Every structure is written in C-alpha cells, then in structure tokens.
Amino acid sequence: MLEPQYKRVLLKLSGEALAGEKGFGLDPNVVTNIATQVKDIVNMGVEVAIVVGGGNYWRGRTGEGMDRTTADYMGMLATVINALALQDSLENLDVLTRVQSAIEMRQIAEPYIRRRAVRHLEKNRVVIFAAGTGNPYFSTDTTAALRAAEIEADVILLAKNVDGVYSADPSIDKTATKFNELTYIDVLKMGLKVMDSTAISLCMDNSIPIKVFGLEDPENIKKVIYGDKIGTYIYS
C-alpha cells in the first residue's frame, strides 16, 4: 500500500485551471474533478489547504485605465466566487470544508485567522483561502507562499494548465524544454514564469518546496501526493 509523501499540503489552483477549455468562468466538470481528487487525498489522511486564483473572471493587471488598487480588489472578489464554488462541490462529496476570506464577508466566509485555520486542518477539514492576502499589489501566488508558511505546509502543489516548468512557453515555442527539478535560485536567475519573484523568494526564505504539475490527468493530484515523478520539483 502506497503511503502519502506529505502530511499537510497547500494546493494552489489558478482561476484558468477552474475554467477548463472554456477559458472563462467555471467548468463544473473540472471543479467536480478537482473536488473528487481532494476528497481522495483527504481520505488518505492528508491535511489540505487551498488557495484559488481569480483569473477566470478578472486579472487586476488587465484593468487598463483603472486604478491598480481597485482592479486588484476586483480580482480578490473573483477568488471568493471560485472558493465558494469549490466549497460547494466538496461539500456535495461530503467533505467538510471552510472558506476563510482575507477580506471580511461574514455571511459567506470566515475571516482569515491562522490558528483557526490550523485547527480546521487538524480536524481533517479542507480550508480554502479566498481574497488573496487582502492587500492590493500581492498576487495569489504570494498568498499561497504566505499561507503555506503560516500553516507550516510540507509543500505547495502548484496545479497549472501545463505539465511542469518549461524554458519557454510551450504553446508558443515548440523547442521549449521541460525541467524535472530546479532550485529557487535557478527560477529567479532564469526568469521562469512559475510564480512571481515575491512568492518564490518567500518559499526560498522558508524552505517550502514547490511541485508544479498539470491537471490534464484527473489522477495527478493523487500521484503527486504518492511521490510520483511528474511535473517539476522546485527546492532550496
């Protein structure tokens, strides 16, 4: 019987990943598939926290002519939509789930309180962190790194639309090569588009490894938990 390689993980989901092939909004089949995989790893005894992006509805940096702070807050609200959708899908599968928002909206989510989040995890509840850090100018990648450090996660699982980290965008450059392993310094020096530099630096300072993988295989989250050699592993 295979044993999970991690006890507590932080799963970072991009908004685009939740949109599936539609590219915008939510694909119910994709959300259900992710929820099913999360249920499977919770049943293994793994504690799961999730950070969701909002790029399937809004990206702060695309708000041309708009105040950056306002655009970023709109992006934070988009992450709340995704968090609630994922919570609903998980609870339909009988997975106890809590959404914690960095911007208070008590009718629909708990406020983010680190100690409460850790207690939820210890009770095998999934915790979804919404609204980024609650501050403009910080991406959801940085949120993932920050929350992973705060809850002392063993690893960040970075689920993307591509199956790892490449030397260039594989959808544009057909000669792009995939990396199996990288150090944080490699990522920063080569300017690879894994996470933004703030997030990478935060992971490096706190020795939090990152596993980058694609969602094209509906079993990939489980495979990563079991230690399968897929995607790209980033470490100190």
From Swiss-Prot:
Residues 20-25 are annotated as: Involved in allosteric activation by GTP. ATP binds at K12, L13, S14, G15, G55, R59, N161, Y166, D169. Its main location: cytoplasm. It is found in: Cytoplasm. UMP binds at G54, D72, T133, G134, N135, P136, Y137, F138, S139, T140. The keyword Cytoplasm applies. GO terms for molecular function: ATP binding; UMP kinase activity. SUPFAM superfamilies: Carbamate kinase-like. It catalyses: UMP + ATP = UDP + ADP. Pathway: Pyrimidine metabolism; CTP biosynthesis via de novo pathway; UDP from UMP (UMPK route): step 1/1. NCBIfam families: pyrH_bact. Catalyzes the reversible phosphorylation of UMP to UDP. This is Uridylate kinase. It comes from Alkaliphilus oremlandii (strain OhILAs). The gene is pyrH.
